[in-house]
């Protein structure tokens, strides 16, 4: 088994969908506004809604192929599905909910019960009923149940949408462990930018039932940033040094570095940083005596002027895209044009703690 390949067209009532993308593994986020077609696409992958034509496969395991007449029923697709609500059996203990998945899957186990329980940190919950669990605990059990069915693919349909912020922060580290340690490809549906920034290896953008862009998270995230106040770009780096006196970590981005105030980072740790366009300023040259620590040499690659007071300036940093949201007046005052060599000033707060992850 390997990654997921989707190339389909179909309908859900009057709603038409046309989707094509390939995901190599890890977490593939389906991102779009409400009504974009995320859940419809997930249902077609799961087999509960039939496309009109096309093909869906996980590696060399074909789930649907209209031309060859293949349309496996949901129970034959080896897919673990986690919904917005946990959908646990209320009359069963947590342990029985988990073991039921193994029995219902009718497949030889590739992961031990104890391994899954340890991965999700639910050992202390085994004798409890779902009604006594918090929302985050119920979702962790639901993920464990899906994983114990020995899936070739996991589908997570907005699994955190019913949780408050505290419960989301509680469960996100376990989903990260699932991504990093289970080796099962995951399709993650969300309209929350923060979750996508933290979890996704690949992003598929959906709008009105069509895939508008897909690819590596670092490449696709700037497209979200250009349209959203909450977007940004993702930069991967490694902690190259740590200053104990000032509690500052230095992140090597390959030819440049960021300083990040975070006592939890350790040397040689691989991290992902998120930089929002609203937190990036531009200078013609490196300013003197400035409190901002993170300065990057960049090239202006594009300027998009809206009808309002703001403009979005597209920047290139050693082959990686950045963005800066400036006023149109600032763009004119700086005399910015495509090809200019300038300096991006990144405020310390724009390095999002929630977007940092250990690889």
Curated annotation (Swiss-Prot):
It catalyses: molybdate(out) + ATP + H2O = molybdate(in) + ADP + phosphate + H(+). This is Molybdenum import ATP-binding protein ModC. It holds the Pfam family ABC_tran. InterPro entries: AAA+_ATPase, ABC_transporter-like_ATP-bd, ABC_transporter-like_CS, Mo/tungstate-bd_C_term_dom, ModC_ABC_ATP-bd, Molybdenum_import_ModC, Mop_domain, P-loop_NTPase. Its EC number is 7.3.2.5. Residues 1-233 form the ABC transporter domain. ATP binds at residues 32-39.
């Amino acid at each position: 088994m390997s990654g997921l390949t989707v190339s389909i067209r179909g309908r859900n009532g009057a709603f038409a969908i046309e989707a094509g993308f390939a995901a190599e593994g890890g977490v593939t986020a389906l991102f779009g506004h409400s009504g974009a077609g995320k859940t419809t696409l997930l249902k077609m992958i799961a087999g509960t809604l039939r496309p009109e034509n096309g093909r869906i496969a996980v590696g060399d395991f074909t789930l649907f192929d209209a031309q060859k007449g293949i349309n496996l029923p949901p129970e034959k697709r080896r897919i673990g599905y986690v919904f917005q609500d946990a959908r646990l059996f209320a009359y069963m203990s947590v342990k029985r909910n988990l073991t039921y998945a193994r029995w219902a899957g009718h497949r030889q186990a590739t992961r031990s019960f104890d391994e899954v329980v340890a991965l999700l940190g639910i050992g202390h919950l085994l004798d409890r009923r779902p009604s006594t669990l918090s929302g985050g605990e119920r979702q962790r059990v639901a993920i464990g149940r899906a994983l114990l069915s020995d899936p070739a693919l996991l589908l997570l349909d907005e699994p955190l949408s019913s949780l408050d912020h505290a419960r989301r922060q509680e469960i996100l580290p376990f989903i990260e462990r699932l991504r990093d340690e289970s080796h099962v490809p995951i399709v993650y549906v969300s309209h929350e930018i923060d979750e996508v920034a933290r979890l996704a290896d690949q992003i598929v953008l959906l709008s009105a039932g069509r895939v508008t862009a897909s690819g590596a998270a670092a490449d696709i995230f700037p497209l979200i940033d250009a349209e959203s106040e909450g977007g940004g770009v993702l930069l991967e780096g490694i902690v190259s040094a740590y200053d104990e006196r000032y509690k500052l970590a230095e992140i090597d981005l390959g030819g440049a570095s960021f300083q990040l105030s975070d006592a939890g980072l350790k040397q040689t740790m691989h991290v992902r940083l998120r930089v929002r366009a609203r937190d990036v300023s531009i200078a013609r040259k490196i300013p003197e005596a400035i409190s901002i620590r993170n300065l990057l040499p960049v090239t202006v690659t594009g300027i998009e002027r809206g009808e309002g007071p703001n403009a979005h300036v597209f920047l290139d940093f050693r082959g990686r895209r950045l963005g800066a949201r400036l006023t149109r007046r600032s763009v004119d005052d700086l005399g910015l044009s495509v090809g200019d060599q300038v300096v991006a000033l990144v405020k310390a707060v724009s390095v999002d703690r929630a977007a940092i992850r250990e690889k």
